[in-house]
Amino acid sequence: MPSIRAPAAKKTTTLTVAVKCRPLMEKERGRDIVRVNNSKEVVVLDPDLSKDYLDRIQNRTKEKKYCFDHAFGPESTNKNVYRSMSSVISSVVHGLNATVFAYGSTGSGKTYTMVGTRSDPGLMVLSLNTIFDMIKSDKSSDEFEVTCSYLEVYNEVIYDLLEKSSGHLELREDPEQGIVVAGLRSIKVHSADRILELLNLGNSRRKTESTEMNGTSSRSHAVLEIAVKRRQKNQNQVMRGKLALVDLAGSERAAETNNGGQKLRDGANINRSLLALANCINALGKQHKKGLAYVPYRNSKLTRILKDGLSGNSQTVMVATISPADSQYHHTVNTLKYADRAKEIKTHIQKNIGTIDTHMSDYQRMIDNLQSEVSQLKTQLAEKESQLSIKPFERGVERELSWLDGLSHQISENVQDRINLQKALFELEETNLRNRTELQHLDDAIAKQATEKDVVEALSSRRQVILDNIRDNDEAGVNYQRDIEENEKHRCELQDMLNEAINNNGNKTYLHILNQYKLLGMGNTELQFEMAMRDQIIYNQREAQRNLWNLLMGLGVEEKQVFDLAAKQGITIEDWSSIALFPGLPYRKQTPSFIPANIPFVGHSYSKSSCTFQSYQDPSSKGQQWAPTPTLCREEHHSSYYFMRQEPPAFVNLRKSHDGWVGGSRPASRIDTGGNHRRVSYPQTVNNSSPRMASGPTFYQTPQREMLLNTTSPYSSPRVGLINGATTPSVQPFYGSPRAVTVRNGSYNTPLAPAAVSTKGARNQQRVFGTSPLSGTKGVKNSSYGQNSHTKLYRGGGTKGHSKGNNTQRQHQ
């Protein structure tokens, strides 16, 4: 595992927005309508000069005024623009991230600003010179390493501009590095001239076309990334900085460019990705004024690449380029409108500091990637050699295989799109859940402050904002559902194509196997996605518990004070650190005053090799019968715990002790005559402060859905006890850690009715009951692995049980 030092405190900063107006070109027959005042204010005049006197005196004009961090007129050069952001570029050498991107319509001067010419070099060239000048002038003994990569996004497909024949590249999410492009070539460089050579090489491979709006229009988005590693010679420390320079393609209108065919499709894809970027800027800008809002990063690959630059760990500069011509009034105003909203976006920056272990792990990763690349090249070479010796009559088979490969690629893209849509829908629902929680808190606050009009008005205003966000998110969710339905229709079409190929081709066995393989691959990918989502939720819940406990300890609050205060509020806190006071003995063994005479002592041990908790009974306990030992099983790939036993579960009894409410077990009353129903006794009196159980025998109906220990006695005679004051044996959780704390806050105002359990067939078949951390997630199922039985949990509490094979039915009131 790489070793990472605790990062320094995060610093919150806003986007730096600069506006550059290009000069008026000779072919533009019109007047200049843009004015730059005091290097900060931009005024766009009304392009219509024919308005009558009444319109002018009534101030009905299209004139617009904006203020930005920096504003540059037509006479400014790229060096003037660069001086305003040079401090951001220099911070890359000291372990910080920086992003610079140009935004504007086609022909407004984005590529000129970023790349420039020999006489007026652009921001990319000037940034590279600054980085290497700082490395050369550094007087410390630190070692520097600079790498460069260059990619383009063309028609929502990523290509490597440093590779002669680059294939399609995919985006991946790395837990340490964030969004990365799999297979992107990164070249080690030692001077700015070398990077300029690579930049010119990449620009020669970049997609450009001539349109009526721009003679050299960029048809793709380009991202030049410079990574700087700084290693201190006498210390075990590495700092990593990253500079991303982005040249976006310009938005365009089909009516103005008169494009057709491929150019028209390219323009549509460019506008689509820029619209996704504009929506992200709008959502991020709203968060400063209206609070929590969903940001649709997944709508485009461009926005996913720029995610860190827009809201992550990066200092970001946005250069908005505009045209002064009156014919470009609408494009100019739209660009300035989005630039004005971008001023509200905030990012959180911190130094990227690691240790030498991280440095060495990067080399190991590079070695693994090179070995994988060598293996792929060998495979491709073998395929090429076999193709050279192919016979003419086999070319038909080759065409069929090529068609199958293309169909396979479409299936993979269909599955990946579905996963992305499901992820986006999941994030949207999570955002709405937090909004509804805040809405509930606002309603409670309004009810408490009914007499304070000013406070109620402020809370009501905030409540309306939250309702608007919920409504917007619901509309976005409907759109995602529609996209998922269209994706499913496309999947059915692909399936029909495969079935048709199977019916029309003579080699039906091979095609049928291929079809099944692709379908299994699709199902496996979706299952991996569901598992990843559930693991993420488990991790978030555990982090929340750990942070809560660390917060209490950091404030100097003692555990006894926490327990006393929680007991007064009706909250139960179980400290799992007191599970085993003495090794080898269960907790109940060490409290003899609470032990009934005929209940054996049961302990639990964990086997790391088999990933199971094995229960055992103390042979010195009173009693003459031995019950089958239950087992607590953990499925490695599900990270969930399942309690396995031979008997049906009895209810969990609760008692009130000095530590609050704890669980106790009572045996179920049973009538074991053949064919008769078994009866399970549930408590008839429950205190209001005790947690409420859900309809299943092993579930709490609380927001946390924590699993409570549920055991049965091997003896047939029931012991009747009271809830309050009964001296029942305390039951501790199966697994414990010194810092693990479970907080439950539940209430139950009505008595629980008796529950009947009827069985048919075999009595002692093994059954499994379990819970999942995903019980609150819509559409995600939880299966307990046992003999023909499983349990599903749904949002809002409650369970739905299904059983197969043993005809078991449960009825609960």
From Swiss-Prot:
Q: Give me the gene this protein comes from.
A: KIN8B
- PROSITE patterns hit by this protein: KINESIN_MOTOR_1 (PS00411), KINESIN_MOTOR_2 (PS50067)
Question: Looking at the keywords, is Coiled coil present?
Answer: yes
Provide ranges: composition bias, Polar residues. 682-694, 761-791, 804-813
Under the heading SMART domains, the entry gives:
KISc
Gene3D superfamilies named among the record's database cross-references = Kinesin motor domain (3.40.850.10)
- Organism of this sequence: Arabidopsis thaliana (Mouse-ear cress)
What cellular component terms from Gene Ontology apply here? microtubule
Q: Does the keyword Nucleotide-binding apply?
A: yes
Q: What biological-process GO terms show up in the record?
A: microtubule-based movement
The protein in question is named: Kinesin-like protein KIN-8B
Q: Where along the chain is ATP bound? A: 104-111
